[in-house]
Amino acid sequence: MTDAAAVIERVRQRVDPTPAERRALAAAASRLTERAEAAIAELPVAADVVQVGSTARGTWVAGDRDIDLFVRFPSDLPREQLETYGTTVGAAVLPDGHEEYAEHPYVTGTFEGYAVDLVPCYDVAAATEIKSAVDRTPFHTTYLQEHLDDGLAADVRLCKQFLKGIGVYGSDLRTQGFSGYLCELLVVEYGGFEAMLAAIEDWQPPVVIDPAAHQQASFDDPLVVVDPTDPERNVAAVVSAANVATVQHHARRFRATPSEDAFTPASPAPLDAAALRSHIDRRDTTPLAVVLDAPDVVADQLYPQLYRSRDGVVRGLREHGFDVVRAAAWADERAVVFVELASAELPAVERHVGPPVSVGTHAERFYETYADDDGVYGPFVDDDGRYVVERDRDVRTAGGFARTELGTVALGARIESRVASGDYDVYVGDAVVEALLPEFESELAAYVDPKA
């Protein structure tokens, strides 16, 4: 047995559900289905129940306790009635559950220790005819039930655990990683987990995988996996370029040096105030934090706005002459844009380079603009033959920028409204430590010890 095979066998023992787990889940799903069918029988419309997701396809990892049931209603049913009937069935099946809202309401709750979602959808003839995003999910289950055998399903579990171990599992907009469905499609496409790693090692983004050979739509993403049930959809659309590269890095490392560590999420060492101060002192950089109460929106709406705000702040700082080492954005009860700077203060003057003297009218206009300005040094000609002036900076400190200039940079909508009202705080240097700990201890611990 090779080193890789030995490691994989040990991981299989961790991720494969036991026969008892399988029987218990199947029994619970059966009882839930019976409840749903009984509730449907009381409705004035026909509908059926299908189990979807990893537990329906046999690709769930040991310890997962999720059951997803979809109630399919006629495609001509008005949306309002679909929502009403769907939540009626959900309440009957999960009397202690509660409603949540995606594209339309569904009921979530617990049953015999399992987390259960009961979701109404339309019974359409094909995924290309969907009336709501969830309508395509049953087609995913059908497709994979036709293409997965027990061996491939077991390899999907390995794939999921591998991606969890390296921190890129999850299609939420915070993680920007790989969904369970994407894992399944990749394992099917390449014929197994090890073959998938070998293929990933050789990826040259943009990577395009078209399982059903649709060859219809084009996508502008680093990884494209065309949904075999819907040629207009890229299953990997949410996966960031950084996470594509991270998977490649770990695929290469595992194939070179197999280790169970690849399947185990890293746990950063605890970080207290003294350790954070020591890290900052050792790097001789200056941290800056813009902190505000987290907007009351779901994570998939919040994080794109946070990431846009982070990028806008970084771009604004750089445009004002600051050297940004690295930046991040986090949210809990509060939201944070965190920026590490080479220096938090700049010289009183900045160099403003104009056009080459040789370009005539444009150069003359630059010269005349500053020729009689007593507030600048110059204009003079530099060694490259360009006009240059040295002028006073509008903003000399990073803290000053964050307090007065945030309204000029691109921010997420909810962040922008808080900034416009002045409802945010700015911390620079040592003040960041007390402001962010202990609320953001895990995020800061990962930040100070970055790993691919």
From Swiss-Prot:
The keyword Chaperone does not apply. ATP binds at residues 54, 57, 140, 160, 169. NCBIfam families: cca_archaeal. Belongs to the tRNA nucleotidyltransferase/poly(A) polymerase family. Archaeal CCA-adding enzyme subfamily. CTP binds at residues 54, 57, 140, 160, 169. It catalyses: a tRNA precursor + 2 CTP + ATP = a tRNA with a 3' CCA end + 3 diphosphate; a tRNA with a 3' CCA end + 2 CTP + ATP = a tRNA with a 3' CCACCA end + 3 diphosphate. This is CCA-adding enzyme. Its EC number is 2.7.7.72. One of its GO terms (molecular function) is tRNA binding. Catalyzes the addition and repair of the essential 3'-terminal CCA sequence in tRNAs without using a nucleic acid template. Adds these three nucleotides in the order of C, C, and A to the tRNA nucleotide-73, using CTP and ATP as substrates and producing inorganic pyrophosphate. tRNA 3'-terminal CCA addition is required both for tRNA processing and repair. Also involved in tRNA surveillance by mediating tandem CCA addition to generate a CCACCA at the 3' terminus of unstable tRNAs. While stable tRNAs receive only 3'-terminal CCA, unstable tRNAs are marked with CCACCA and rapidly degraded. Its cofactor is Mg(2+). GO terms for biological process: RNA repair; tRNA 3'-terminal CCA addition. It comes from the Archaea. Disulfide bonds: none annotated. Pfam families: CAA_C, NTP_transf_2, tRNA_NucTransf2. A single active site specifically recognizes both ATP and CTP and is responsible for their addition. Keywords: ATP-binding, Magnesium, Metal-binding, Nucleotide-binding, Nucleotidyltransferase, RNA repair, RNA-binding, Transferase, tRNA processing. Homodimer. The keyword Transmembrane helix does not apply. Mg(2+) binds at residues 66, 68, 117. The gene is cca. InterPro entries: CAA_C, CCA-adding_arc, CCA_tRNA_nucleotrans_2, NT_2-5OAS_ClassI-CCAase, NT_sf, NuclTrfase_I-like_C, Polymerase_NTP_transf_dom, tRNA_NucTransf2.
